[in-house]
């Protein structure tokens, strides 16, 4: 189980990313449309003044049950070993073990 402080930090990052999403997207569109370099620098400075944690690249997918940041399956929102345990216990409908 991940520390609660790390899970809380990740939730805080998600809120910041949602808050600044439109601002970041609009400023990136402006940068691509503006021809002069000096105006691009001004817009880039505005983009840089937004909080660091508002960038979507700083987000991690975490396991829904344990908060583990690695080996996550997007379809289930679970880490690999929790997914395996739940499939063995028949807790995930439609998921089957492969055998050949």
Swiss-Prot record:
SUPFAM superfamilies: Glucocorticoid receptor-like (DNA-binding domain)
Keyword Transferase found: no
Biological processes per GO annotation: translation
Key word Plastid present: yes
One GO CC term on file: chloroplast
Subcellular location: Plastid, Chloroplast
Domain of life of the organism encoding this protein: Eukaryota
Keyword terms of this UniProt record: Chloroplast, Plastid, Ribonucleoprotein, Ribosomal protein, RNA-binding, rRNA-binding
GO molecular function, one term: rRNA binding
HAMAP family (alphabetical): Ribosomal_uS14_1
Role summary: Binds 16S rRNA, required for the assembly of 30S particles.
PANTHER family tied to this protein: 30S RIBOSOMAL PROTEIN S14, SMALL RIBOSOMAL SUBUNIT PROTEIN US14M
Protein family according to the UniProt entry: Belongs to the universal ribosomal protein uS14 family.
UniProt subunit comment: Part of the 30S ribosomal subunit.
Record protein name field: Small ribosomal subunit protein uS14c
Organism: Gossypium hirsutum (Upland cotton)
Lineage: Eukaryota, Viridiplantae, Streptophyta, Embryophyta, Tracheophyta
């Amino acid at each position: 189980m991940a520390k609660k402080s790390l899970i809380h930090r990740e939730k805080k990052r998600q809120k910041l990313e949602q808050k600044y999403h439109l601002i970041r997207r609009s400023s990136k569109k402006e940068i691509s449309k503006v021809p002069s370099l000096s105006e691009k620098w001004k817009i880039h400075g505005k983009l840089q003044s937004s909080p660091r944690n508002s960038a979507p690249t700083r987000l991690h997918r975490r396991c829904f049950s344990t908060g583990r940041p690695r080996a996550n399956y997007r379809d289930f929102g679970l880490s690999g070993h929790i997914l395996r345990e739940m499939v063995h216990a028949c807790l995930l409908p439609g998921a089957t073990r492969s055998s050949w």
